[in-house]
């Protein structure tokens, strides 16, 4: 059991969730328990999340796509996450309106004993899920490429939904970290301007880059971090367990008390479950929307980046600096830089682009495009600054 692959564990959890979703929703309508119905919708959230996760994972691995999809399917998960969040909020509105109606005219739960047993079975299924994923809620050493930069957890969409975090766990299993090595020759004026660059910390290790200033950092580094992929699934399962505890509490309260208002406990638990769902759905929609709107991550201040680049030797001004997230794990930057260089433009410009990349890499940005504008053509710099 402990050696099960992560994707196998997710499929097992998906099968359990589907089974108990039908058990809870059928029983909930049969005995008129809104708490069971609400908890079944909470479980439906997990089902949709895991289905989107598996679908997006396969899309992310797919190399067959039309040429017009220049970034492939890397944003499929974000789109799925936003759809899932909107769907959850709509479900919460439905449950909330039903709960209000039951406060006005509280129906009697016909079989609290059955409600108790269904809630207990649901709790047992969640203990199985916690058993499958509990070892992924802790820190452990992990090798990754620098392109999979870990920016602060509060900015990471996977901290609120497993549908986007499972992708990283599966791709990390299949990625093979590798280092490209190359003889470090001195650059001359006859050398290609962007034929080499330094590594992340500015050392002299050479590395190939493409011809428009985009760098791919492949050297693996060892870090100690939580596996947020499976940790997110673990938190979701834990949330389901809390929902089942609420259902069990409502069943026991209705069965073993004789208060005239005891049936109000059922819609109270339903509203509590609604807030639990909204607690994950609203941050999910916000995070997904910010990525789709190409907003700069909260962890990066554009003024700080611009000031650091401006202080580099040879930089006259910086404009058109854009930083955004392609997905929850990949940052992209483009920048126009007005530069003043001595006569040996080839070597000086190569060093300057390396310095600019090192600045951006310090913020976790490894996909960089730099457009130079030379100060000996002031019209270009003036036009760029005013655009």
Curated annotation (Swiss-Prot):
Annotated compartments: Endoplasmic reticulum membrane; Nucleus membrane
Molecular function (Gene Ontology), one example: zinc ion transmembrane transporter activity
GO annotation (BP), single: zinc ion import into endoplasmic reticulum
Keyword Chloroplast: no
InterPro entries cross-referenced by the UniProt entry: Cation_efflux, Cation_efflux_CTD_sf, Cation_efflux_TMD_sf
Entry superkingdom: Eukaryota
Chain intervals for the UniProt region annotation (Disordered): 195-221
One GO location term (cellular component): fungal-type vacuole membrane
Keywords: Endoplasmic reticulum, Ion transport, Membrane, Nucleus, Transmembrane, Transmembrane helix, Transport, Zinc, Zinc transport
Biased composition (Polar residues): 195-214
Membrane topology, record value: Multi-pass membrane protein
Extent of the signal sequence: none
Pfam families: Cation_efflux
Membrane-spanning intervals of the chain: 10-30, 34-54, 77-97, 113-133, 234-254, 263-283
Its job: Involved in zinc homeostasis, where it plays a role in its accumulation in the endoplasmic reticulum/nucleus. Also has a role in the sequestration of cadmium into the endoplasmic reticulum.
Family: Belongs to the cation diffusion facilitator (CDF) transporter (TC 2.A.4) family. SLC30A subfamily.
Record-given protein name: Zinc homeostasis factor 1
Species this protein is from: Schizosaccharomyces pombe (strain 972 / ATCC 24843) (Fission yeast)
Gene from which the chain derives: zhf1
């Amino acid at each position: 059991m402990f050696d099960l692959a992560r994707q196998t564990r997710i499929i097992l959890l998906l099968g359990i969730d589907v089974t108990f979703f039908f058990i809870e929703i059928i029983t909930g309508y049969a005995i008129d328990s809104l708490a069971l119905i609400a908890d079944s919708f909470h479980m439906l959230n997990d089902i949709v999340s895991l289905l989107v996760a598996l679908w997006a994972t396969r899309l992310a691995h797919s190399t067959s796509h039309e040429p017009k999809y220049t970034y492939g399917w890397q944003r499929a998960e974000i789109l799925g996450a936003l759809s899932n969040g909107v769907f959850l909020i709509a479900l919460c509105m439905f449950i909330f309106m039903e709960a209000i109606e039951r406060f006005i005219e509280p129906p009697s739960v016909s079989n609290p004993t059955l409600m108790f047993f269904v809630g207990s079975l649901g709790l047992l299924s969640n203990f199985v899920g916690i058993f499958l994923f509990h070892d992924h809620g802790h820190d452990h050493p992990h090798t990754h490429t620098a392109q999979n930069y870990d920016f602060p957890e509060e900015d990471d969409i996977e901290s609120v939904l497993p549908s986007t975090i499972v992708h990283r766990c599966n791709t990390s299993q299949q990625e093979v970290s590798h280092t490209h090595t190359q003889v470090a020759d001195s650059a001359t004026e006859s050398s290609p301007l962007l034929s080499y660059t330094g590594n992340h910390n500015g050392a002299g290790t050479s590395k190939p880059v493409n011809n428009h200033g985009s760098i791919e950092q492949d050297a693996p580094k060892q870090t100690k971090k939580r596996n947020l992929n499976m940790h997110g699934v673990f938190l979701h399962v834990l949330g389901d367990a809390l929902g089942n505890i609420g259902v069990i509490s409502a069943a026991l309260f209705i069965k073993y008390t004789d208060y005239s208002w005891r049936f109000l406990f059922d819609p109270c638990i339903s509203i509590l479950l609604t807030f639990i769902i909204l607690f994950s759905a609203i941050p999910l929609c916000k995070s997904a929307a910010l990525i789709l709107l190409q907003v700069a991550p909260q962890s990066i201040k554009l003024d700080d980046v611009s000031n650091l680049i401006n202080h580099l030797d040879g930089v006259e001004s910086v404009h058109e600096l854009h930083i955004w997230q392609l997905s929850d794990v990949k940052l992209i930057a483009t920048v126009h830089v007005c530069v003043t260089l001595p006569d040996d433009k080839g070597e000086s410009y190569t060093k300057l682009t390396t310095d600019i990349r090192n600045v951006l890499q310090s913020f976790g940005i490894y996909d960089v495009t730099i457009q130079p504008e030379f100060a000996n053509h002031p019209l270009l710099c003036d036009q760029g600054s005013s655009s």
